[in-house]
Amino acid sequence: MARYLGPKLKLSRREGTDLFLKSGVRAIDSKCKIEQAPGQHGARKPRLSDYGVQLREKQKVRRIYGVLERQFRNYYKEAARLKGNTGENLLALLEGRLDNVVYRMGFGATRAEARQLVSHKAIVVNGRVVNIASYQVSPNDVVSVREKAKKQSRVKAALELAEQREKPTWLEVDAAKMEGVFKRQPERSDLSADINEHLIVELYSK
């Protein structure tokens, strides 16, 4: 699948947040201030219309999870088809992606690194190797690092980094075994308040 290969810090500065989790892995150069807009001196951000605000929120969430436009729209369509709140359904689908679950369990330092582990066949789901990043993990699925990948220094480093983060309540992780259980889908209260999914629903509902 195609993926964005351009300057990631520039996108983070545009959205005003660490989209790609770089600051948790290494110190970001002081010249690359996330809160400052792209440009030599941080171009002044234009005043956005309602549509512009909705579009910017969609772009932010899409980039956080590393999903391209067509796939993101398909996630929205599936979320709208399911029972319940469309915005919350959308976030649950994104959180259920295998690459995201691998990141949440602490096996990858960033979602991009977790996606690479999946594509390199380093991740096992219920005893079977799965190399599709968008694979939807279901409640009670067991996700683990493949035996021959457990010695990788990046996996060990990621687990150490994960110890500094708040542990997701919807997951159960045995760091020593490099194995975890997806106990349930996360509830809205479990996830970041920095995301306004209602704006995305408004955008796609037009």
UniProtKB/Swiss-Prot annotation:
Lineage top rank: taxon: Bacteria
Domain S4 RNA-binding residue range list: 96-156
GO biological process: ribosomal small subunit biogenesis; translation
Gene Ontology MF terms in the entry: rRNA binding; structural constituent of ribosome
Keyword Ribonucleoprotein: yes
Keyword annotations: Ribonucleoprotein, Ribosomal protein, RNA-binding, rRNA-binding
Key word Calcium present: no
Record CDD domains: S4
Any one cellular-component term (Gene Ontology): small ribosomal subunit
Coiled coil: none
Signal peptide (UniProt feature, chain positions): none
Function summary: One of the primary rRNA binding proteins, it binds directly to 16S rRNA where it nucleates assembly of the body of the 30S subunit. With S5 and S12 plays an important role in translational accuracy.
The protein's assembly and partners: Part of the 30S ribosomal subunit. Contacts protein S5. The interaction surface between S4 and S5 is involved in control of translational fidelity.
Protein family: Belongs to the universal ribosomal protein uS4 family.
HAMAP family documented for this protein: Ribosomal_uS4_B (MF_01306_B)
Name of the protein in its database record: Small ribosomal subunit protein uS4
Organism: Edwardsiella ictaluri (strain 93-146)
